[in-house]
Amino acid sequence: MSRTIFCTFLNKEADGLDFQLYPGELGKRIFNEISKEAWGQWMAKQTMLINEKKLNTMNPDDRKLLEQEMVRFLFEGHDVHIDGYTPPEK
């Protein structure tokens, strides 16, 4: 049975993550406040960031950038900006 949480990103009740995906205090916050749906949206943005900016997840500076962008996206309401990308019209 899945857990239900209040997702602070989506501003609604939603299925929570099955387990903590990120280490430390930030990981606990993500586990408690971010839904599967919101995490999936972040994963898509993260993939775009890695590909477009040619980031290497083995590089500590690149990992730090990804973490900063993740916090901005999930908790501060900022969208990920990628040069030259225009989101599709809804």
Curated annotation (Swiss-Prot):
Q: Which residues form a coiled coil?
A: none
Record flagged with keyword Repeat:
no
A single GO molecular function, which one?
A: iron ion binding
List all disulphide bridges recorded for this chain. none
The record's Gene Ontology biological-process terms are: cellular response to oxidative stress
Q: Which UniProt keywords apply?
A: Iron
Work out whether the entry's keyword set contains Iron. yes
Record's GO cellular component terms = cytosol
A Pfam match is Iron_traffic
State whether it acts alone or in a complex, and with which partners, per the record. Answer: Monomer.
Q: Which family does it belong to?
A: Belongs to the Fe(2+)-trafficking protein family.
Q: What does this chain do?
A: Could be a mediator in iron transactions between iron acquisition and iron-requiring processes, such as synthesis and/or repair of Fe-S clusters in biosynthetic enzymes.
Q: Spell out the NCBIfam families in the cross-references.
A: PRK05408.1
Identification of the protein by name: Probable Fe(2+)-trafficking protein
Give the source lineage, highest ranks first: Bacteria, Pseudomonadati, Pseudomonadota, Gammaproteobacteria, Enterobacterales
